[in-house]
Amino acid sequence: VIVTRNVTWNLPRPDLAYREWLRVLKPGGVLYNFDADWYGHLYNEEKRNSYEKDRHQTEEQQVEDYYRGTDIEKMEEIARQVPLSRLERPKWDLETMTKTGFLDVSCDEAVWKEVWTEEEIINNSTSPIFLLTGRKRAAFHLKNITVEPGQKWNGELELADGEIRLPATVLHGHAEGKTMLITAGVHAGEYVGIQAAIELSQKLKIEKVIGTIIIVKVMNRPAFEHRNGSMGLTDGRNLNREFPGNPDGTEMERLAWAVSQELQPVADFYIDLHSGDDYEKLTPYVYYAGAAPENVVKISREMAEQV
């Protein structure tokens, strides 16, 4: 948890404060920022009149005037040099927090009733303190992989207790959303799909990712590395015909089982890239699940139309 009070208003780049708070928070952590539109009266006539009303009110009720006890000219000079005195708050804060990547962003504009003394209320009744709250997205966990929000991971994804190691990229965006699984190399000789997955993993910008994207560049890795075409290296089986697989079966059966049990269940959407094998020439096309529940067929078709 990060708790701050009256920090942002006097910063030349208050947006950087929100960026740094998000950076240092642990995944799932929360920011509580107490602040107020302290010097909006310098640029708004209505707020100026309200500010003067507060000053008269402190005098009438014979309480200490917090502003009179400071160097007003110096403080206003400082306030004119920083951007938040001119911006509408907390609207600016809410928009900036959302843009930065905070989740569940909210503002409690009545918190002053709980935290201010009667004297503080008299002094600042027309510029009440508010409480801004935002949460950092939780990290993404999959087998041997942990990826924090806003991060991109490259390496080997381990399935079946490390027996299977697949080259993969995971992009875990700041903003929450769906999880997309993209695979290639089910047939190890279909190089176009594999190359497409590699290029996609390199070109995707983490700043634009909403949700999580998992890219497995080569599923049938042994056959790919030995240039053994599209069948299993040791069993000669077609991985694309072995799902859901068998944990005690042959090489391709075990791979199919690991993927169907450990990888596919984490995804909301799944795209499997294929192409012509090294001896084939194919016309580009996209097909989608037809023998499935109606809602799956509908969503799959919508995906296929966009691809």
Per-region residue spans from a language model:
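Conserved class I S-adenosyl-L-methionine
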Residues: 30-70
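Structured catalytic-domain cores with a bias toward divalent-metal coordination
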Residues: 140-307
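A short glycine-rich, Lys/Arg-flanked "PGG" loop and its adjoining helix->strand segment in the class I
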Residues: 15-30
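Short "lid" loop at the C-terminus of a central beta-strand within the Rossmann-like core
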Residues: 36-41, 110-112, 221, 276
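A conserved beta-strand element that flanks and buttresses the S-adenosyl-L-methionine
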Residues: 3
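Short catalytic micro-motifs in class I SAM-dependent methyltransferases
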Residues: 6-7
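Core SAM-dependent methyltransferase catalytic element
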Residues: 100-101, 117-138
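Short alpha-helix
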Residues: 84-108
